[in-house]
């Protein structure tokens, strides 16, 4: 399965993606996101960690306003 980076505060999303069989990595900085197929960020500070630019090869999903299920669906559609 895919390697998904999830921002530290999104523990419910981390658990849901792990249950789906994904490798989940907690991202606290831009460096943590490297090598991830996709990253999920809170969007509270949309570019706080520099992840919104091209620092990773995968998609960046802004979790702001989305449910855990909606986030998981977006992850599945982008990997």
From Swiss-Prot:
Superkingdom in the source lineage: Bacteria
Cysteine disulfide links: none
Family: Belongs to the UPF0180 family.
Protein name: UPF0180 protein BCE_1513
Lineage summary: Bacteria, Bacillati, Bacillota, Bacilli, Bacillales
